[in-house]
Amino acid sequence: MTQTLSQLENRDAFIERHIGPDAQQQQEMLKTVGADSLNALIGQIVPQDIQLATPPQVGDATTEFAALAELKAIASRNKRFKSYIGMGYTAVQLPPVIQRNMLENPGWYTAYTPYQPEVSQGRLESLLNFQQVTLDLTGLDIASASLLDEATAAAEAMAMAKRVSKLKSANRFFVAADVHPQTLDVVRTRAETFGFDVIVDDADKVLDHQDVFGVLLQQVGTTGEIHDYSKLIAELKARKVIVSVAADFMALVLLTAPGKQGADIVFGSAQRFGVPMGYGGPHAAFFAAKDEFKRSMPGRIIGVSKDAAGNTALRMAMQTREQHIRREKANSNICTSQVLLANIASLYAVFHGPAGLKRIAGRIHRLTDILADGLQKKGLKLRHAHYFDTLCVEVADKAAVLARAEALQINLRSDIHGAVGITLDEATTREDVLNLFRAIVGDDHGLDIDTLDKDVALDSRSIPAAMLRDDAILTHPVFNRYHSETEMMRYMHALERKDLALNQAMIPLGSCTMKLNAAAEMIPITWPEFAELHPFCPVEQAEGYQQMIAQLSDWLVKLTGYDAVCMQPNSGAQGEYAGLLAIRHYHESRNEGHRDICLIPSSAHGTNPASAQMAGMQVVVVACDKNGNIDLADLREKAEQAGANLSCIMVTYPSTHGVYEETIREVCEIVHQFGGQVYLDGANMNAQVGITSPGFIGADVSHLNLHKTFCIPHGGGGPGMGSIGVKAHLAPFVPGHSVVQIEGMLTRQGAVSAAPFGSASILPISWMYIRMMGAEGLKQASQNAILNANYIATRLKDAYPVLYTGRDGRVAHECILDIRPLKEETGISELDIAKRLIDFGFHAPTMSFPVAGTLMVEPTESESKVELDRFIDAMLAIRAEIDRVKAGEWPLEDNPLVNAPHTQGELVGEWNHPYSRELAVFPAGLHNKYWPTVKRLDDVYGDRNLFCSCVPMSEYQ
């Protein structure tokens, strides 16, 4: 029969490209698991009472090219003005060699957080470089591998200051009046739940205030003034007050390091090291502290360790500090950071080197001096005599200045009484400065750049002599070698080859949803229409963003069954925190602020109790039964005990144990019966979309991991987006923003992130995914994720017991393989299996979560049967190797598992093992072999000998 035009147009072609198994493979897999069809399989697994009767109304699928054209038309509604607003956001020039070979390279952006260091040495090295940049510029002893943004870093600094303070009775945190307003906003939000009293005053009045445990100063104030705080810091230190300083990476190239002036903590945004503004993000924050506080640092820290052969190797150090270990004792819920963006900043520093950075910073400052000199020659007054890149200019007719600026497509900072703010950047040119003269003075300004340049070159005093940096920065060879594009390209490629990402193999991490990040989804993030907008630009310049965000929000509302969505939280953990704050403020609005007990099942992700703790709640753990389900009797008992103090329950669905609990609606009803709210963790939404929804189940609020379910890549450990969906009664209590209040912002509550829409520039990825998949495609994705997991469970259950199953022995979208019986029999652990998988070319599944001694496997819908079979074959081969150990053929202390992974170096060295080299390094054959560059890491050595800065280049030879 002749095909119709509609069939030939193939508008749902992307569905088949996103979903790994084709129709024939699906049938083969269904036969293996014993189901007649996808719908029949879902009917056996998902409780009937929560299955949607009709699909969410998010439209039909469309092609990649049609979706790109549609989004391009939306993006074109954004107006690309020159933004000199500043406030922590500036235009940048991302080196094309970094954009092409790193930002747009799936070898970098599809990797996972480097929990498996043996397959992560490349980005770990780049993150170590980032830490070295931070250490050199801040003058402190230890640095983290990035935080979410500058404002949340400020909140983390406050929390850390309280942790390490010796003034245990003090409960006040002082913030200098000239910090960025969005920073103050987030600090106030965090302080409220911690019970801290935030004092805002001029910095020189800080000594007038008593009972202060910590102080936040900003080296270059929000309106541009450079501060020499050395004397003040000394006085504060004499009082045992912890001093945090917000700083600017580019300014620090020229200015003295706050650490040298005595600061305990220094943080800020690394955005201007090559990361586009992106209407607010994503951007990496840097964070550094004195060595004595290293065990209280928030976020990830990369450390230098040794591998089993004694060679230098890198790893994430001191992971016992993290929230998933400390749980309800945590005071930070940092999980995802901003690895991809930190690595852009790191490589920017490598590419430019110290000389290049000084040239860029010097040019920015020289142009600022020229602008200042010209304006003063025209009789205008500057508020501050000392500045780096920002001027605060007093103007008589502010409206006229802003009107001229708008006509020239220029944005100035307009919220300063009687003045305008102007922040220059590395993209600013001579012509831009002339246009600024036209905007502020008028067309007949009569000023000449070269003449002004000569004047300021002779007499520039805008940076006080005491504030000029007098020490060398970035002296390590890595920052002084790769300055030609050829060298830089090869360096980035060398780093990439050390790592295992989705462009090499399936990453079967349970609870992580490492699905396809399609090229068509990624293309829009570098469009200048999205990349170049300042987050605080006038709303009429961001109509494209507003339309895109509104459409995406509407789709997410329909997919979740909620009434509203807030896009501000820029990680899943931030989403949890924001959702719990909404619950807290809702109770307070009803004069029930005493409701502070949060029930959390024992199987929960570690961020759940950490977020509850941060939101000012008491955590009460609810037991799970032998099948891994919430124990309803224990839940009812705990809810009754909490009574009028019950705030909420945090529950994951499908459960963290990988099953659809039949009683989920009853769980919701019990909590609601006692006046509590239901927080449904969205970590496992990839098994819900199109099949059921949190709102339909009965939940009140969820965060959505757009970097899991909706295809934003993990970036090697960030960025993420933790947008929250809420029922109508909670909508007035989601985060707001102090700087930007526009239509679409649901609330006037405090902010949890620096920018109003979080990491806005990666939202087009999720928009593209939903638009190309349509309602039917999204449902098929969930169905195939479930099919793939059940296929793996079915084929592996005889070799590795599946710990938890639901009705009919099925699992949801992931399964937990119980390694404990094998370890008891043979001594081989889940760690040995994880490391041996590297020799087969796979990243390990999630280890020992949510149950110690297990492996949790989540294949996602994007992996084909061919790749699933390759993984299954590897796991079965490993089981056969375990049996050989059990039989005594290989000793427990010397076999392919305990010695894994094996490196190329072992091919040419001495060989004294009872198994062959071929079995060691080519267990899956010769084709497309992945080579780890280090052997198994020595975690104990790394934590006992903490070293978190760049090592000599000879160590990498």
Curated annotation (Swiss-Prot):
Cofactor: pyridoxal 5'-phosphate
Keyword presence, Cytoplasm: no
Species annotation: Klebsiella pneumoniae subsp. pneumoniae (strain ATCC 700721 / MGH 78578)
Catalysed conversion reaction: N(6)-[(R)-lipoyl]-L-lysyl-[glycine-cleavage complex H protein] + glycine + H(+) = N(6)-[(R)-S(8)-aminomethyldihydrolipoyl]-L-lysyl-[glycine-cleavage complex H protein] + CO2
Modified-residue entries (N6-(pyridoxal phosphate)lysine), positions: 708
InterPro entries recorded: GcvP, GDC-P_C, GDC-P_N, GDC_P, PyrdxlP-dep_Trfase, PyrdxlP-dep_Trfase_major, PyrdxlP-dep_Trfase_small
Subunit structure and binding partners: The glycine cleavage system is composed of four proteins: P, T, L and H.
Domain of life: Bacteria
Pfam family, one: GDC-P
One GO CC annotation: cytosol
The EC number(s) this enzyme carries: 1.4.4.2
Family membership noted in the UniProt record: Belongs to the GcvP family.
UniProtKB keywords: Oxidoreductase, Pyridoxal phosphate
Annotated GO MF terms: glycine binding; glycine dehydrogenase (decarboxylating) activity; pyridoxal phosphate binding
An individual GO BP term: glycine decarboxylation via glycine cleavage system
Name used for this protein in its record: Glycine dehydrogenase (decarboxylating)
Enzyme superclass (EC): oxidoreductase
Function: The glycine cleavage system catalyzes the degradation of glycine. The P protein binds the alpha-amino group of glycine through its pyridoxal phosphate cofactor; CO(2) is released and the remaining methylamine moiety is then transferred to the lipoamide cofactor of the H protein.
Xref: CDD domains: GDC-P
